[in-house]
Amino acid sequence: ERIGNGKVYGIDYSALCIKHSKAQNRKNILCNKVKIVLASVSSLPFEDCSFDVVIAVETYYFWPDKLNDLKEIYRVLKQNGRIMLVFEMLKTPEEPDKWKAVEDKVGIKTVTEEEIREMLAKAGFEDIETHKKDGTTWLCAIGVKK
């Protein structure tokens, strides 16, 4: 309802997650409002300048080549398109080792707000904004393809 005549695409590199997503979104898939695709952020199966918005929630830590993956998202965004990255596990100066146990167990690396801003800029994004949720490490980073 909220997307009007638009369409939402979901991607994941896990076949199990794709199966779950298709089950959860069955109605909207049948109405051709949602399409779920098995793919990697490193090689998105979409034409250049295809999307108005790309949103990634709690996935950045797992990307194999963060700079190139951000450039791949930049490629599929339309001019003035936006990327939105959402993080819970944010490394902060106050608690630099807060997520260390998770990093070690899962094999990921958390990043700081400044590192996220720098990577978005290196990938070509402009008008970069970051928004923190007070009292938490939640962060939303937004960049624009000009």
Predicted regions mapped to residue ranges:
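Class I SAM-dependent methyltransferase SAM/SAH-binding core
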Residues: E1-S43
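Helix-to-beta-strand junctions that scaffold the AdoMet/dcAdoMet cofactor pocket
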Residues: I3, L30, W63-P64, L77-Q79
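A short acidic, Gly/Pro-enriched loop at the edge of an enzyme's catalytic core
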Residues: S42-V54
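A short beta-strand submotif of the Rossmann-like class I SAM-dependent methyltransferase core
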Residues: A56-T59
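A short glycine-rich, Lys/Arg-flanked "PGG" loop and its adjoining helix->strand segment in the class I
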Residues: L67-R82
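Conserved class I S-adenosyl-L-methionine
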Residues: R82-E113
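Core SAM-dependent methyltransferase catalytic element
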Residues: A123-K146
